[in-house]
Design a protein with these regions (language model features):
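A contiguous, well-structured pocket-lining segment that forms one wall/lid of small-molecule binding clefts
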Residues: 89-163, 169-175
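Short beta-strand scaffold segments in enzyme catalytic cores
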Residues: 19, 37-39, 45-49
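Conserved phosphate-binding catalytic cores of ATP/NTP-utilizing and phosphoryl-transfer enzymes
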Residues: 6, 10-36
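Short beta-strand-loop/turn "lid" adjacent to the catalytic site in phosphate-handling enzymes
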Residues: 1-2
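Glycine-rich phosphate-binding loop plus the immediately following alpha-helix
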Residues: 15, 51-97, 120, 124-129
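Short glycine-aspartate micro-motif
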Residues: 35-39, 67, 164
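Solvent-exposed alpha-helices and their adjacent loops that cap or buttress functional pockets
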Residues: 24-32, 37-41, 53-54, 97, ...
């Protein structure tokens, strides 16, 4: 930054995801006011309450998974189905070929939930011979259901706040 005479803002990995998501959504204005952010990546599934903090933002976790992340579940699904790692793009593409569009109701309490039951159900479907496309749809639709329910619960506590999604998992077509 010094060599190029540009500002340097030290930030966390999470703050970087939040800023990148705001920029790519064309909503840099969100960084100047409170909002909610889903950080959905390979290792993180967190619902954050974000407030301005000087030139950066401060994020407080208010929900998300209590065990494995959405990205881990998607990659485990891909591995189970023999797909390449990381499996996000392949699971996303395969889900669009699903003939049966079922989902699992993820139990959400205070905007928090667990994906271990969903992982067990995915493994059971694979053992039963369910088509890979149907399994991919099932997993993604179930993740989305959990995220949507947690978002609704959080908006009861933080009414009217906009919601932004950040991270690689958030880029799938169903999301």
């Amino acid at each position: 930054a010094t060599t190029m005479a540009i500002p340097f803002y030290p930030c966390s990995h999470q703050q970087g995801h939040i800023a990148a998501a705001a920029w790519s959504a064309g909503r840099m204005d969100l960084l100047d006011r409170p909002h909610l952010v889903w950080h959905l990546s390979g290792g993180t599934t967190e619902l954050l309450h974000v407030v301005p903090d000087g030139v950066l933002v401060k994020a407080t976790c208010i929900g998300g998974t209590t065990d494995i992340s959405a990205g881990q579940l998607i990659d485990r699904t891909g591995k189970r189905l023999g797909l390449a790692f990381p499996a996000g793009k392949a699971v996303d593409a395969l889900s669009r070929e699903a003939a049966h569009r079922d989902s699992f109701r993820v139990k959400v309490h205070d905007a928090s939930f667990s994906f271990s039951g969903l992982e067990n159900k995915m493994n059971a479907l694979a053992q039963q011979g369910t088509s890979p496309a149907d399994i991919c749809w099932f997993v993604l639709a179930s993740i989305i259901q959990g995220v949507e329910t947690a978002t609704r619960q959080a908006l009861e506590q933080y009414p009217g706040l906009p919601v932004l999604c950040a991270g690689g998992v958030a880029s799938n077509q169903l999301m």
